């Protein structure tokens, strides 16, 4: 069933890819990424993963600001990845792969940091994704999850926007999901309206 959902979501984002970097979307992500990176802690020679990388905006910015950084972008959509590769000015340090967050094709403890921006809401099994994030993070590494949130009293909120819908999680719900995966919440930060950054740490 999950595989069918991923296939449908892939088609949804493939169709969106040629228009994804329109001015409105670009301005939105520019603002979100700028605020998010104010809280990001990256070591020298950082190895980073961006799950749901889309057209590669965040990784390009990270590479421009961190000259020793090596990054991998993962996305369901071949068309999104084609856009990311065509815009990749840092091909010696960035690469893009097809895949989903519930089955990461990477080694244990491979990354210093993992990013996920406005993508977690699409994942049908968030517990699986967070367990995979914890697996590929180095001990002491950070997971930066930026996504739309809801008030605590509303619980989770489901919206039929894309195949299988999208789901928004309250700060408390994020904390619980992370705890189950071995990820401790360091802090929450509101970035832009209801977009909340939750910083997780993998316990050393």
Task: Mark where each language-model region is.
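Short glycine-centered segments of the SAM/dcSAM-binding site in methyltransferase folds
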Residues: 47, 141-142
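C-terminal alpha-helical "lid/dimerization" subdomain adjacent to the S-adenosyl-L-methionine
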Residues: 4, 144-198
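Class I SAM-dependent methyltransferase SAM/SAH-binding core
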Residues: 49-51, 55-103
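A short glycine-rich, Lys/Arg-flanked "PGG" loop and its adjoining helix->strand segment in the class I
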Residues: 127-139
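A short acidic, Gly/Pro-enriched loop at the edge of an enzyme's catalytic core
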Residues: 102-113
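A short SAM/SAH-binding and catalytic strip from SAM-dependent methyltransferases
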Residues: 113-125
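Conserved class I S-adenosyl-L-methionine
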Residues: 1-41, 57-61, 80-83, 87, ...
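C-terminal lobe and adjacent flexible extensions of AdoMet/dcAdoMet transferase-like proteins
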Residues: 199-204
């Amino acid at each position: 069933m999950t595989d069918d959902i991923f296939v449908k979501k892939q088609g949804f984002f493939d169709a969106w890819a040629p228009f994804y970097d329109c001015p409105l979307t670009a301005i939105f992500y520019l603002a979100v990424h700028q605020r998010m990176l104010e809280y990001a802690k990256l070591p020298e020679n950082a190895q980073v993963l961006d799950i749901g990388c889309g057209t590669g905006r965040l990784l390009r910015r990270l590479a421009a600001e961190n000259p020793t950084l090596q990054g991998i972008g993962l996305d369901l959509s071949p068309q999104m990845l084609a856009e990311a590769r065509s815009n990749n000015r840092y091909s010696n340090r960035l690469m893009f792969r097809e895949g989903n967050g519930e089955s990461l094709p990477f080694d244990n403890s491979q990354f210093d940091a993992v990013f996920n921006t406005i993508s977690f809401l699409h994942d049908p099994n968030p517990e699986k994704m967070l367990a995979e994030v914890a697996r590929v993070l180095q001990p002491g590494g950070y997971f930066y999850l930026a996504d739309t949130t809801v008030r605590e009293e509303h619980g989770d909120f489901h919206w039929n926007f894309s195949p299988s819908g999208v789901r928004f999680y309250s700060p408390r719900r994020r904390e619980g999901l992370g705890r189950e995966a071995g990820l401790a919440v360091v802090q929450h930060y509101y970035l832009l309206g209801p977009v909340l950054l939750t910083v997780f740490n993998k316990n050393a």
